[in-house]
């Protein structure tokens, strides 16, 4: 069975000055998940980067229409549909690249 590890997404918090920032530890967790996937030879999809990276949760909350909730932690249905589309495109692209490499190696004498 194939396994895909999907990283944690962005999660923001308000600083004492009222600014929104990516929570400490999110980037380290994503790196840990990516290394774990590599160590176990399973697929990895970086949802944090797919969302737009650091500070992207705030962008999703304030998008019109909104793609995430005002807790700056959870995506909503529209955000889920958007990210699902990005994941689908990534999987299709990966399959196309795999098929091209496979066809290339099958052509060699």
PLM-predicted stretches and their roles:
Residues 10-109:
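Catalytic His-Asp segment of secreted/periplasmic serine-dependent ester chemistry enzymes
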């Amino acid at each position: 069975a194939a396994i895909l590890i999907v990283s944690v997404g962005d999660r923001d918090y308000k600083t004492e000055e009222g600014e929104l920032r990516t929570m400490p530890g999110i980037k380290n967790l994503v790196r840990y998940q990516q290394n774990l996937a590599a160590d176990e030879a399973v697929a990895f999809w970086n949802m944090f980067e797919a969302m737009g990276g650091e500070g992207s949760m705030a962008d999703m909350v304030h998008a019109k229409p909104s793609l995430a909730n005002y807790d700056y932690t959870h995506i909503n249905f529209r955000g889920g549909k958007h990210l699902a589309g990005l994941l689908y495109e990534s999987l299709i692209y990966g399959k196309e690249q795999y098929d091209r490499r496979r066809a290339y190696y099958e052509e060699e004498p």
